[in-house]
Amino acid sequence: QQDKNSLSGVYNYNPMLESLNDAQKALILGMQANLWCEYIPSRERIQYMIMPRMMALAELAWSDPSVKSWDGFKERLVKQFPRLNIMNVNYRMPDLEGFNNTNAFIGEGTVAITCLDPSVEIHYTTDGSIPTLESPQYNGPIKVTETTDFTFRSFRPNGKKGDIVKTRYVKSEYAPAADATPSKKGLQAVWHEFKGNKCADIDNAPVNGTYEISEVTIPKEVKGNIGLVVTGYFNAPEDGIYTFNLLSDDGSTLKINGELVVDNDGPHSPREVTGQKALAKGLHPIEVKYFDHNGGMLQLKVLTADGKELPVNADMFAY
């Protein structure tokens, strides 16, 4: 299943592996992409899986790395959507942007949605039902004053439906900081011998070891059947609404102050899920659970209210 990073992941891929020397790099003549179809039931689904990623691959193959520009590619891509519509290609519509899976606001919030494809109509519901062309159309920012669940869906001019997107806007107050005095910098990671596929079951599995880590990641000693429970405190530098981007392969969850903020659970390929939490300045208990059975990936990024990523340093986490 593709996500918001799938297209940029192709465009930003570097085929010149660091392990290759200059003579070996000169032997690379081109690129090839493959699509495994054992779980793809139709030609339409094939088109959905390869377009517009095929365009990103083509530009990656013929462009010198020094002139590559993701923003420039997006500008060129916008001009191709009308052609794809005329050709009736079942391309994957660009992801709706401007929100997280969970969004926090103080007092009054604003729902402001954008889409790279200008030809689509965006419709939405707030009762949990699936949007149709008869549902309210999104025509501009929406003010929210209470916790509200939105379901969005894009529609192409020919009526083709895009992916269903759900997001929650949570009316919040700044969660108070904990009265705690942790003794160590970083986080504690407990590795369980876990063979399941739900984060909630990890605690029941036998423990293989305990590790100290500086950030949310898989300790280098951990391999095979992985069930991780990472605990500690996040040090919020000031009162604010923080965005937490949790990337994992397979499942993961993030709790802050005991509340589920990011739910990226279940078996899946690399996927990033985002959530927000309003936090007062100071220490806040966090818990990340994660599982995988064949290597995997785990990463947490924290952004401030103005979208700036907080650097991982000795003051960010403690336990």
Regions found by a protein language model. Name each.
Residues Q1-Q2, E38-S42, I130-T132, K198-A200, ...:
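Flexible loop/turn segments at secondary-structure boundaries
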Residues A26, D249, G295-M297:
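Short, solvent-exposed loop/turn segments at the edges of secondary structure
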Residues K68, K74-V190, K195-N235, I241, ...:
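Short, compositionally stereotyped local motifs that mark structural "simplifiers"
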Residues K277-L279, F291, L300-Y319:
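C-terminal effector modules
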Residues E287-G296:
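Short beta-strand-plus-loop segments that form exposed binding edges in beta-rich domains
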